[in-house]
Amino acid sequence: MKTSEENNALESAASPEERINLSRFRWVLGAPYFVEGTMSLTEIPILYFIKFTLGMGGAGGQLFDSLRQIGWFIKPVWGYISDKVPIFGYHRKSWYVLMAFLACVFWVINALLSFIGLRVAEVYLLTFNLAFATYAFVDVVCDALMVTYGRREGKVGAFVNFQWTILAIANAGSVYLGGWFETRIQERIDHLWLVFLLTGGPPLLTAIVGILFIDETRVEIEKKKKKRASFEDFRGGVKKVFHWLRTAPASFREFRRNNRPMWFMMLFIFFWKFSPSIGFIERSYLIDVRGFTPDAFGIILSAGGVTFLVSVLVYSWVVKKIPSIGWHHYLYAMVALGVITFPLSFYLYLNPNHPWWKFIYFRIPEWLNPLPGWNRYEWFRLVVQVTLGFATIPAFMIPLTIAGETVNLAYAGMGYAFLMSLSNVTNLFEGVVGAGLYDLFSKPSMRGLLDTFQASFLNIAGTTDTRTLILEMFVYISLFFTLLTIPFIELLRRELDRRGIEVHLGGSKSA
Protein backbone atom coordinates (compact mmCIF):
# COMPACT_ATOMS: atom_id res chain seq x y z
CA MET A 1 0.00 0.00 0.00
CA LYS A 2 2.38 2.69 -1.22
CA THR A 3 2.01 5.57 -3.62
CA SER A 4 3.88 5.61 -6.94
CA GLU A 5 6.11 8.36 -5.54
CA GLU A 6 7.15 6.10 -2.65
CA ASN A 7 7.85 3.26 -5.06
CA ASN A 8 10.02 5.52 -7.22
CA ALA A 9 11.85 6.79 -4.15
CA LEU A 10 12.67 3.26 -3.07
CA GLU A 11 13.73 2.18 -6.56
CA SER A 12 16.11 5.12 -6.82
CA ALA A 13 18.18 3.64 -3.97
CA ALA A 14 19.27 0.69 -6.14
CA SER A 15 22.71 0.72 -7.75
CA PRO A 16 24.62 -1.93 -9.77
CA GLU A 17 27.58 -1.80 -7.40
CA GLU A 18 25.55 -2.46 -4.26
CA ARG A 19 23.31 -5.04 -5.99
CA ILE A 20 20.46 -4.32 -3.61
CA ASN A 21 17.21 -5.70 -4.92
CA LEU A 22 14.70 -3.35 -3.35
CA SER A 23 11.77 -5.50 -4.36
CA ARG A 24 13.23 -8.29 -2.23
CA PHE A 25 14.25 -5.82 0.45
CA ARG A 26 10.64 -4.66 0.82
CA TRP A 27 9.70 -8.24 1.67
CA VAL A 28 12.42 -8.33 4.33
CA LEU A 29 11.21 -5.03 5.82
CA GLY A 30 7.50 -5.75 5.50
CA ALA A 31 7.09 -9.41 6.48
CA PRO A 32 8.03 -9.01 10.19
CA TYR A 33 5.71 -6.03 10.58
CA PHE A 34 2.87 -7.89 8.85
CA VAL A 35 3.41 -10.82 11.22
CA GLU A 36 3.52 -8.48 14.23
CA GLY A 37 0.16 -7.13 13.09
CA THR A 38 -1.33 -10.63 12.98
CA MET A 39 -0.37 -10.99 16.65
CA SER A 40 -3.37 -8.69 17.35
CA LEU A 41 -5.56 -11.73 16.70
CA THR A 42 -4.98 -12.54 20.39
CA GLU A 43 -5.65 -9.03 21.75
CA ILE A 44 -9.37 -9.32 22.55
CA PRO A 45 -9.34 -13.05 23.46
CA ILE A 46 -6.52 -12.40 25.95
CA LEU A 47 -8.52 -9.50 27.48
CA TYR A 48 -11.41 -11.86 28.23
CA PHE A 49 -9.02 -14.66 29.20
CA ILE A 50 -7.42 -12.45 31.87
CA LYS A 51 -10.74 -11.15 33.17
CA PHE A 52 -12.89 -14.28 33.18
CA THR A 53 -10.70 -17.39 32.86
CA LEU A 54 -7.87 -16.25 35.13
CA GLY A 55 -10.37 -14.25 37.22
CA MET A 56 -8.14 -11.22 37.74
CA GLY A 57 -9.47 -7.94 39.13
CA GLY A 58 -8.66 -4.40 38.02
CA ALA A 59 -5.14 -3.88 39.40
CA GLY A 60 -4.09 -7.52 38.99
CA GLY A 61 -5.40 -7.72 35.44
CA GLN A 62 -3.70 -4.44 34.53
CA LEU A 63 -0.41 -5.71 35.95
CA PHE A 64 -0.63 -9.02 34.05
CA ASP A 65 -1.60 -7.23 30.84
CA SER A 66 1.47 -4.99 31.19
CA LEU A 67 3.95 -7.66 32.24
CA ARG A 68 3.11 -9.92 29.30
CA GLN A 69 5.04 -7.43 27.16
CA ILE A 70 8.36 -8.02 28.96
CA GLY A 71 9.61 -10.08 26.03
CA TRP A 72 10.00 -6.88 24.03
CA PHE A 73 12.40 -5.37 26.59
CA ILE A 74 15.42 -7.41 25.66
CA LYS A 75 15.61 -5.83 22.22
CA PRO A 76 18.96 -4.13 23.06
CA VAL A 77 20.41 -7.55 23.93
CA TRP A 78 19.06 -8.94 20.67
CA GLY A 79 20.51 -5.92 18.88
CA TYR A 80 23.96 -6.52 20.39
CA ILE A 81 23.82 -10.22 19.47
CA SER A 82 22.70 -9.38 15.94
CA ASP A 83 25.53 -6.85 15.56
CA LYS A 84 28.33 -8.88 17.14
CA VAL A 85 27.46 -12.60 17.22
CA PRO A 86 26.99 -14.40 13.89
CA ILE A 87 25.23 -17.76 13.82
CA PHE A 88 25.53 -20.28 10.99
CA GLY A 89 27.78 -17.77 9.23
CA TYR A 90 25.45 -14.73 9.27
CA HIS A 91 24.82 -11.74 11.54
CA ARG A 92 21.24 -11.04 10.42
CA LYS A 93 19.82 -13.81 8.25
CA SER A 94 20.20 -16.80 10.57
CA TRP A 95 18.80 -15.03 13.63
CA TYR A 96 15.92 -13.67 11.56
CA VAL A 97 14.92 -17.16 10.40
CA LEU A 98 15.59 -18.99 13.68
CA MET A 99 13.50 -16.63 15.80
CA ALA A 100 10.62 -16.74 13.32
CA PHE A 101 10.52 -20.53 13.68
CA LEU A 102 10.68 -20.26 17.49
CA ALA A 103 7.68 -17.90 17.45
CA CYS A 104 5.67 -20.72 15.87
CA VAL A 105 6.87 -23.14 18.53
CA PHE A 106 5.91 -20.92 21.48
CA TRP A 107 2.41 -20.21 20.13
CA VAL A 108 1.89 -23.96 19.73
CA ILE A 109 2.91 -24.32 23.40
CA ASN A 110 0.36 -21.65 24.38
CA ALA A 111 -2.28 -23.52 22.40
CA LEU A 112 -1.44 -26.80 24.17
CA LEU A 113 -1.62 -25.16 27.61
CA SER A 114 -5.01 -23.71 26.79
CA PHE A 115 -6.20 -27.01 25.33
CA ILE A 116 -5.44 -28.92 28.55
CA GLY A 117 -7.23 -26.23 30.58
CA LEU A 118 -4.27 -24.84 32.54
CA ARG A 119 -5.22 -21.70 34.50
CA VAL A 120 -1.95 -20.68 36.14
CA ALA A 121 -1.28 -17.00 35.38
CA GLU A 122 2.48 -17.24 35.95
CA VAL A 123 2.86 -19.98 33.33
CA TYR A 124 1.05 -17.96 30.68
CA LEU A 125 3.08 -14.89 31.63
CA LEU A 126 6.22 -16.88 30.82
CA THR A 127 4.99 -18.44 27.57
CA PHE A 128 3.50 -15.20 26.24
CA ASN A 129 6.80 -13.43 26.86
CA LEU A 130 8.81 -16.19 25.21
CA ALA A 131 6.69 -15.75 22.10
CA PHE A 132 6.97 -11.95 22.17
CA ALA A 133 10.75 -12.17 22.67
CA THR A 134 11.08 -13.95 19.32
CA TYR A 135 9.06 -11.23 17.59
CA ALA A 136 11.35 -8.69 19.24
CA PHE A 137 14.49 -10.38 17.87
CA VAL A 138 13.12 -10.50 14.32
CA ASP A 139 12.06 -6.87 14.72
CA VAL A 140 15.58 -5.90 15.79
CA VAL A 141 17.21 -7.58 12.79
CA CYS A 142 14.67 -6.00 10.45
CA ASP A 143 15.21 -2.53 11.95
CA ALA A 144 19.00 -2.91 11.80
CA LEU A 145 18.74 -3.59 8.07
CA MET A 146 16.31 -0.68 7.69
CA VAL A 147 18.58 1.79 9.51
CA THR A 148 21.71 0.67 7.63
CA TYR A 149 20.19 0.97 4.15
CA GLY A 150 17.87 3.83 5.06
CA ARG A 151 20.60 6.08 6.44
CA ARG A 152 22.88 5.36 3.49
CA GLU A 153 20.21 6.29 0.96
CA GLY A 154 18.43 8.97 3.02
CA LYS A 155 15.22 6.90 3.10
CA VAL A 156 14.72 6.21 6.81
CA GLY A 157 11.42 8.10 6.83
CA ALA A 158 10.15 6.26 3.74
CA PHE A 159 11.13 2.86 5.14
CA VAL A 160 9.51 3.59 8.53
CA ASN A 161 6.30 4.70 6.81
CA PHE A 162 6.31 1.53 4.67
CA GLN A 163 6.81 -0.77 7.65
CA TRP A 164 4.01 0.74 9.67
CA THR A 165 1.66 0.78 6.69
CA ILE A 166 2.10 -2.99 6.44
CA LEU A 167 1.59 -3.41 10.19
CA ALA A 168 -1.60 -1.31 10.10
CA ILE A 169 -3.12 -3.51 7.38
CA ALA A 170 -2.42 -6.72 9.29
CA ASN A 171 -3.47 -5.25 12.63
CA ALA A 172 -6.85 -4.01 11.36
CA GLY A 173 -7.85 -7.39 9.98
CA SER A 174 -6.44 -9.43 12.86
CA VAL A 175 -8.04 -7.49 15.69
CA TYR A 176 -11.44 -7.70 13.97
CA LEU A 177 -11.05 -11.47 13.62
CA GLY A 178 -10.01 -11.60 17.28
CA GLY A 179 -13.32 -10.03 18.33
CA TRP A 180 -15.21 -12.45 16.07
CA PHE A 181 -13.36 -15.43 17.53
CA GLU A 182 -14.00 -14.26 21.11
CA THR A 183 -17.74 -14.07 20.42
CA ARG A 184 -17.61 -17.66 19.14
CA ILE A 185 -15.53 -18.68 22.18
CA GLN A 186 -18.18 -17.26 24.52
CA GLU A 187 -20.85 -19.12 22.54
CA ARG A 188 -18.72 -22.29 22.95
CA ILE A 189 -18.40 -22.70 19.18
CA ASP A 190 -14.62 -22.20 19.16
CA HIS A 191 -11.87 -22.34 21.78
CA LEU A 192 -9.00 -20.08 22.82
CA TRP A 193 -6.40 -22.69 21.92
CA LEU A 194 -7.43 -22.36 18.27
CA VAL A 195 -6.68 -18.62 18.35
CA PHE A 196 -3.20 -19.28 19.77
CA LEU A 197 -2.57 -21.99 17.18
CA LEU A 198 -3.61 -19.73 14.29
CA THR A 199 -1.37 -16.95 15.63
CA GLY A 200 1.60 -19.28 15.33
CA GLY A 201 1.13 -19.68 11.58
CA PRO A 202 2.16 -16.27 10.15
CA PRO A 203 5.72 -16.33 11.60
CA LEU A 204 6.45 -19.06 9.06
CA LEU A 205 6.10 -16.35 6.40
CA THR A 206 8.89 -14.38 8.06
CA ALA A 207 11.13 -17.44 8.11
CA ILE A 208 10.52 -18.14 4.41
CA VAL A 209 11.18 -14.49 3.49
CA GLY A 210 14.42 -14.54 5.47
CA ILE A 211 15.61 -17.69 3.71
CA LEU A 212 14.75 -16.44 0.22
CA PHE A 213 15.31 -12.69 0.28
CA ILE A 214 17.99 -11.65 2.79
CA ASP A 215 21.22 -11.08 0.87
CA GLU A 216 24.07 -11.06 3.37
CA THR A 217 27.77 -11.75 3.01
CA ARG A 218 28.75 -14.86 4.88
CA VAL A 219 31.03 -14.23 7.85
CA GLU A 220 34.21 -16.26 7.97
CA ILE A 221 34.98 -17.08 11.59
CA GLU A 222 38.61 -17.71 12.40
CA LYS A 223 39.25 -20.89 14.31
CA LYS A 224 41.56 -20.17 17.18
CA LYS A 225 43.93 -22.83 18.39
CA LYS A 226 43.00 -24.10 21.82
CA LYS A 227 45.58 -23.74 24.51
CA ARG A 228 45.63 -24.58 28.17
CA ALA A 229 44.91 -21.77 30.56
CA SER A 230 47.88 -20.75 32.68
CA PHE A 231 48.39 -18.63 35.77
CA GLU A 232 49.67 -15.83 33.52
CA ASP A 233 46.43 -15.93 31.56
CA PHE A 234 44.45 -15.69 34.80
CA ARG A 235 46.55 -12.78 36.08
CA GLY A 236 46.21 -11.03 32.72
CA GLY A 237 42.44 -11.47 32.85
CA VAL A 238 42.27 -10.00 36.36
CA LYS A 239 44.34 -7.00 35.23
CA LYS A 240 41.97 -6.44 32.30
CA VAL A 241 38.97 -6.50 34.63
CA PHE A 242 40.53 -3.96 37.01
CA HIS A 243 41.59 -1.80 34.08
CA TRP A 244 38.04 -1.88 32.72
CA LEU A 245 36.60 -0.95 36.12
CA ARG A 246 39.11 1.90 36.50
CA THR A 247 38.48 3.33 33.04
CA ALA A 248 34.72 2.64 32.90
CA PRO A 249 33.62 6.06 34.26
CA ALA A 250 35.81 7.94 31.77
CA SER A 251 34.72 5.66 28.93
CA PHE A 252 31.09 6.22 29.85
CA ARG A 253 31.57 10.00 29.89
CA GLU A 254 33.23 9.82 26.48
CA PHE A 255 30.42 7.63 25.15
CA ARG A 256 27.85 10.07 26.52
CA ARG A 257 29.59 13.03 24.86
CA ASN A 258 29.85 11.26 21.51
CA ASN A 259 26.24 10.10 21.64
CA ARG A 260 24.63 13.13 23.24
CA PRO A 261 21.69 13.18 20.78
CA MET A 262 20.78 9.64 21.81
CA TRP A 263 20.57 10.64 25.48
CA PHE A 264 18.24 13.49 24.61
CA MET A 265 16.29 11.05 22.47
CA MET A 266 15.96 8.72 25.46
CA LEU A 267 14.54 11.50 27.63
CA PHE A 268 12.21 12.59 24.86
CA ILE A 269 10.88 9.07 24.16
CA PHE A 270 10.29 8.35 27.84
CA PHE A 271 8.41 11.55 28.63
CA TRP A 272 6.61 11.58 25.27
CA LYS A 273 5.33 8.04 25.80
CA PHE A 274 4.82 7.90 29.56
CA SER A 275 1.46 8.39 31.21
CA PRO A 276 0.09 6.00 33.87
CA SER A 277 -2.02 3.55 31.87
CA ILE A 278 -5.23 1.76 32.83
CA GLY A 279 -6.04 0.11 29.49
CA PHE A 280 -7.19 -3.23 30.94
CA ILE A 281 -9.03 -1.54 33.82
CA GLU A 282 -10.92 0.75 31.46
CA ARG A 283 -11.87 -2.08 29.09
CA SER A 284 -13.01 -4.16 32.05
CA TYR A 285 -15.19 -1.22 33.14
CA LEU A 286 -16.66 -0.94 29.64
CA ILE A 287 -17.56 -4.65 29.69
CA ASP A 288 -19.12 -4.54 33.18
CA VAL A 289 -20.82 -1.12 33.15
CA ARG A 290 -21.28 -0.02 29.53
CA GLY A 291 -22.14 -3.37 27.99
CA PHE A 292 -19.30 -3.65 25.47
CA THR A 293 -19.18 -6.99 23.62
CA PRO A 294 -16.24 -8.78 21.95
CA ASP A 295 -17.67 -7.87 18.54
CA ALA A 296 -17.83 -4.21 19.56
CA PHE A 297 -14.20 -4.24 20.68
CA GLY A 298 -13.25 -5.99 17.45
CA ILE A 299 -14.99 -3.44 15.23
CA ILE A 300 -13.70 -0.46 17.23
CA LEU A 301 -10.10 -1.64 17.29
CA SER A 302 -10.24 -2.72 13.65
CA ALA A 303 -11.60 0.69 12.66
CA GLY A 304 -8.70 2.17 14.60
CA GLY A 305 -6.33 -0.02 12.58
CA VAL A 306 -7.87 1.12 9.28
CA THR A 307 -7.64 4.72 10.48
CA PHE A 308 -4.00 4.12 11.36
CA LEU A 309 -3.37 2.85 7.83
CA VAL A 310 -5.10 5.80 6.14
CA SER A 311 -3.39 8.29 8.43
CA VAL A 312 0.05 6.77 7.70
CA LEU A 313 -0.58 7.22 3.97
CA VAL A 314 -1.85 10.78 4.45
CA TYR A 315 1.04 11.58 6.78
CA SER A 316 3.54 10.23 4.22
CA TRP A 317 1.97 12.42 1.53
CA VAL A 318 1.87 15.55 3.71
CA VAL A 319 5.49 15.37 4.87
CA LYS A 320 6.62 14.94 1.24
CA LYS A 321 4.48 17.76 -0.11
CA ILE A 322 5.06 20.21 2.76
CA PRO A 323 8.63 19.57 3.95
CA SER A 324 8.85 23.05 5.46
CA ILE A 325 6.86 21.92 8.50
CA GLY A 326 9.38 20.74 11.08
CA TRP A 327 9.00 17.61 13.16
CA HIS A 328 8.70 19.68 16.34
CA HIS A 329 5.80 21.66 14.86
CA TYR A 330 3.84 18.44 14.43
CA LEU A 331 4.57 17.35 17.99
CA TYR A 332 3.58 20.70 19.49
CA ALA A 333 0.34 20.40 17.51
CA MET A 334 -0.20 16.94 19.02
CA VAL A 335 0.20 18.35 22.53
CA ALA A 336 -2.27 21.14 21.75
CA LEU A 337 -4.74 18.60 20.35
CA GLY A 338 -4.42 16.47 23.47
CA VAL A 339 -5.19 19.46 25.70
CA ILE A 340 -8.16 20.60 23.61
CA THR A 341 -9.77 17.17 23.39
CA PHE A 342 -9.08 15.88 26.90
CA PRO A 343 -12.72 16.55 28.06
CA LEU A 344 -13.82 13.82 25.62
CA SER A 345 -12.13 11.28 27.89
CA PHE A 346 -14.89 11.78 30.48
CA TYR A 347 -17.80 10.75 28.26
CA LEU A 348 -17.42 7.01 28.82
CA TYR A 349 -17.98 7.66 32.53
CA LEU A 350 -21.04 9.94 32.15
CA ASN A 351 -24.54 8.56 32.69
CA PRO A 352 -26.99 8.99 29.76
CA ASN A 353 -28.82 11.85 31.52
CA HIS A 354 -25.65 13.91 32.04
CA PRO A 355 -25.96 17.42 30.47
CA TRP A 356 -22.72 17.05 28.49
CA TRP A 357 -24.41 14.49 26.25
CA LYS A 358 -26.73 17.21 24.91
CA PHE A 359 -23.83 18.71 22.97
CA ILE A 360 -23.00 15.62 20.93
CA TYR A 361 -25.78 13.04 21.21
CA PHE A 362 -28.18 12.45 18.33
CA ARG A 363 -30.16 9.48 17.07
CA ILE A 364 -29.53 7.69 13.77
CA PRO A 365 -32.61 6.41 11.90
CA GLU A 366 -32.81 2.63 12.17
CA TRP A 367 -32.63 2.19 8.41
CA LEU A 368 -29.34 4.11 8.34
CA ASN A 369 -27.82 2.43 11.39
CA PRO A 370 -25.36 -0.34 10.40
CA LEU A 371 -25.01 -1.40 14.05
CA PRO A 372 -28.51 -1.17 15.56
CA GLY A 373 -27.58 -3.13 18.68
CA TRP A 374 -24.93 -0.65 19.79
CA ASN A 375 -25.37 1.82 22.65
CA ARG A 376 -24.12 5.40 22.76
CA TYR A 377 -20.91 4.46 24.54
CA GLU A 378 -19.85 1.99 21.86
CA TRP A 379 -20.60 4.53 19.14
CA PHE A 380 -18.74 7.25 21.03
CA ARG A 381 -15.67 5.05 21.44
CA LEU A 382 -15.74 4.21 17.74
CA VAL A 383 -16.03 7.85 16.59
CA VAL A 384 -13.29 9.09 18.93
CA GLN A 385 -11.01 6.17 18.01
CA VAL A 386 -11.35 7.03 14.32
CA THR A 387 -11.13 10.83 14.46
CA LEU A 388 -8.43 11.30 17.08
CA GLY A 389 -6.52 8.24 15.85
CA PHE A 390 -6.29 9.83 12.43
CA ALA A 391 -5.16 13.19 13.76
CA THR A 392 -2.48 11.92 16.14
CA ILE A 393 -0.44 9.69 13.82
CA PRO A 394 2.58 12.10 13.77
CA ALA A 395 2.93 11.53 17.50
CA PHE A 396 3.67 7.89 16.71
CA MET A 397 5.67 8.10 13.48
CA ILE A 398 7.97 11.03 14.19
CA PRO A 399 9.85 9.52 17.18
CA LEU A 400 10.58 6.42 15.05
CA THR A 401 12.05 8.55 12.27
CA ILE A 402 14.12 10.68 14.67
CA ALA A 403 15.51 7.53 16.29
CA GLY A 404 16.54 6.20 12.89
CA GLU A 405 18.28 9.49 12.02
CA THR A 406 20.20 9.85 15.29
CA VAL A 407 21.45 6.34 16.08
CA ASN A 408 25.15 5.63 15.50
CA LEU A 409 25.58 3.36 12.46
CA ALA A 410 28.47 1.56 14.17
CA TYR A 411 25.87 -0.20 16.31
CA ALA A 412 22.71 0.28 14.27
CA GLY A 413 21.04 -2.89 15.52
CA MET A 414 21.75 -2.34 19.20
CA GLY A 415 21.26 1.45 19.12
CA TYR A 416 17.93 1.53 17.31
CA ALA A 417 16.76 -1.51 19.30
CA PHE A 418 17.66 0.27 22.54
CA LEU A 419 15.59 3.32 21.66
CA MET A 420 12.64 1.20 20.53
CA SER A 421 12.99 -1.00 23.62
CA LEU A 422 12.89 2.12 25.76
CA SER A 423 9.54 2.84 24.13
CA ASN A 424 8.37 -0.68 25.03
CA VAL A 425 9.72 -0.36 28.58
CA THR A 426 7.86 2.92 28.95
CA ASN A 427 4.65 1.23 27.83
CA LEU A 428 5.11 -1.50 30.43
CA PHE A 429 6.18 0.95 33.12
CA GLU A 430 3.11 3.12 32.58
CA GLY A 431 0.93 0.02 32.85
CA VAL A 432 2.62 -1.08 36.07
CA VAL A 433 2.39 2.44 37.52
CA GLY A 434 -1.25 2.60 36.46
CA ALA A 435 -1.97 -0.69 38.23
CA GLY A 436 -0.14 0.53 41.33
CA LEU A 437 -1.98 3.85 41.43
CA TYR A 438 -5.35 2.18 40.88
CA ASP A 439 -4.63 -0.25 43.71
CA LEU A 440 -3.47 2.63 45.92
CA PHE A 441 -6.54 4.76 45.24
CA SER A 442 -8.75 1.73 45.97
CA LYS A 443 -7.41 1.29 49.51
CA PRO A 444 -9.57 2.36 52.49
CA SER A 445 -6.81 4.75 53.59
CA MET A 446 -7.39 6.80 50.40
CA ARG A 447 -11.11 7.22 51.03
CA GLY A 448 -10.53 10.80 52.16
CA LEU A 449 -8.89 11.71 48.85
CA LEU A 450 -11.74 10.12 46.90
CA ASP A 451 -14.35 11.91 49.02
CA THR A 452 -12.61 15.23 48.40
CA PHE A 453 -12.45 14.58 44.66
CA GLN A 454 -16.09 13.44 44.64
CA ALA A 455 -17.25 16.69 46.25
CA SER A 456 -15.17 18.91 43.95
CA PHE A 457 -15.93 20.44 40.55
CA LEU A 458 -13.40 17.99 39.06
CA ASN A 459 -15.92 15.16 39.42
CA ILE A 460 -17.44 15.77 35.99
CA ALA A 461 -19.51 12.57 36.10
CA GLY A 462 -21.06 13.55 39.43
CA THR A 463 -20.69 9.95 40.55
CA THR A 464 -20.21 8.28 43.91
CA ASP A 465 -18.94 5.00 42.42
CA THR A 466 -15.36 4.34 43.51
CA ARG A 467 -14.20 2.78 40.25
CA THR A 468 -15.61 5.63 38.16
CA LEU A 469 -14.07 8.25 40.45
CA ILE A 470 -10.63 6.65 40.09
CA LEU A 471 -10.98 6.46 36.30
CA GLU A 472 -11.87 10.17 36.24
CA MET A 473 -8.75 10.96 38.26
CA PHE A 474 -6.66 9.21 35.62
CA VAL A 475 -8.02 11.60 32.98
CA TYR A 476 -6.42 14.50 34.86
CA ILE A 477 -3.21 12.55 35.42
CA SER A 478 -3.01 11.94 31.66
CA LEU A 479 -3.44 15.66 30.96
CA PHE A 480 -0.57 16.49 33.32
CA PHE A 481 1.82 14.13 31.54
CA THR A 482 0.74 15.47 28.15
CA LEU A 483 1.83 18.96 29.19
CA LEU A 484 5.05 17.59 30.69
CA THR A 485 6.31 16.61 27.22
CA ILE A 486 6.68 20.24 26.05
CA PRO A 487 10.15 20.98 27.54
CA PHE A 488 11.55 17.69 26.23
CA ILE A 489 10.45 18.45 22.68
CA GLU A 490 12.33 21.74 22.91
CA LEU A 491 15.44 20.17 24.46
CA LEU A 492 15.66 17.61 21.66
CA ARG A 493 15.08 20.24 18.98
CA ARG A 494 17.94 22.39 20.29
CA GLU A 495 20.32 19.44 20.54
CA LEU A 496 19.60 18.28 16.99
CA ASP A 497 20.06 21.84 15.70
CA ARG A 498 23.35 22.17 17.58
CA ARG A 499 24.60 18.92 16.07
CA GLY A 500 23.36 19.82 12.61
CA ILE A 501 21.23 16.67 12.43
CA GLU A 502 18.41 16.98 9.91
CA VAL A 503 15.29 14.89 10.31
CA HIS A 504 13.77 13.99 6.92
CA LEU A 505 10.19 13.02 7.72
CA GLY A 506 9.49 12.37 4.06
CA GLY A 507 12.49 10.09 3.67
CA SER A 508 14.35 12.34 1.22
CA LYS A 509 17.59 14.22 1.76
CA SER A 510 16.62 16.80 -0.77
CA ALA A 511 13.51 17.62 1.20
Each language-model region and where it sits:
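Glycine-rich segments within core transmembrane alpha-helices of 12-TM secondary carriers
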Residues: 68-75, 157-179, 304, 420-431
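Intracellular juxtamembrane helix-capping segments at the cytosolic ends
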Residues: 137-151, 393-408, 414
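C-terminal transmembrane helical hairpin of 12-TM major facilitator-type secondary transporters
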Residues: 328-398
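Helix-loop boundary and gating motifs at the non-cytosolic
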Residues: 10-72, 261-290, 431
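A membrane-interface helix-boundary motif in multi-pass transporters
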Residues: 90-94, 180-201, 326-327, 438-482
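Transmembrane alpha-helices of Major Facilitator/SLC transporters
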Residues: 71-78, 297-321, 334-342, 427-430
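Helix-to-loop junctions at the C-terminal end of transmembrane segments
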Residues: 73-90, 182, 310-329, 438-439
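Intracellular loop-helix junctions on the cytosolic face of multi-pass helical membrane proteins
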Residues: 1-24, 114-126, 133, 137-142, ...
